[in-house]
Amino acid sequence: MDHVNPTLFHLKSLSIFTLTLLYISSPHFLLFKTLSMYENLRIFLKIIPFNLFGMKSVSLIAILLLHLFVSSDTFQLDLFHCKYYLAITWLINRDNECVIYILVGSFICCIVICEVVDKASGSSIPDCSNACGPCKPCKLVVISSTCSASEACPLVYKCLCKGKYYHVPSLT
């Protein structure tokens, strides 16, 4: 008869519960809810599969909850008299891709890459085809700004080509 390692069993069974608990208690939940109400920011997740205790990929619940943790925080949970530490850090590169690193204790580690796609309310997406002159490829990017949870973040569009920003012609 095979014996189950109690620590491994608890980590397997509580990994989703831990994410759910953080989802409920996280102050960033309200920030995400505010952004989703305005419908000016859509986040698409690209999950990189990894081997987690024999599972072939991340479970559906974890995929739905991971996008809420877009901050640099460390949480401490006391679950069943065992302390688990969840560290979350993130960065946004120049191509507006957000890389989120999540570590629960020393047992769970995953990388989530999400591409931020913006939608201009009431009009079409601005065009960058002629904004960069002869420089190619010229693509539309959104400049990040820091906003509190109680205010809507304005979208600032720029055209980017080879590391240099250009004004968006349709918005000037």
UniProtKB/Swiss-Prot annotation:
Its main location: secreted. GO terms for biological process: guard cell differentiation; stomatal complex development. Disulfide bonds join 128-159, 132-138, 135-161, 147-153. Residues 1-27 form the signal peptide. Keywords: Developmental protein, Disulfide bond, Secreted, Signal. The keyword Disulfide bond applies. It comes from the Eukaryota. GO terms for cellular component: extracellular region. The keyword Chaperone does not apply. It is found in: Secreted. Controls stomatal patterning. Belongs to the plant cysteine rich small secretory peptide family. Epidermal patterning factor subfamily. This is EPIDERMAL PATTERNING FACTOR-like protein 7. It comes from Arabidopsis thaliana (Mouse-ear cress). The lineage of its organism: Eukaryota, Viridiplantae, Streptophyta, Embryophyta, Tracheophyta.
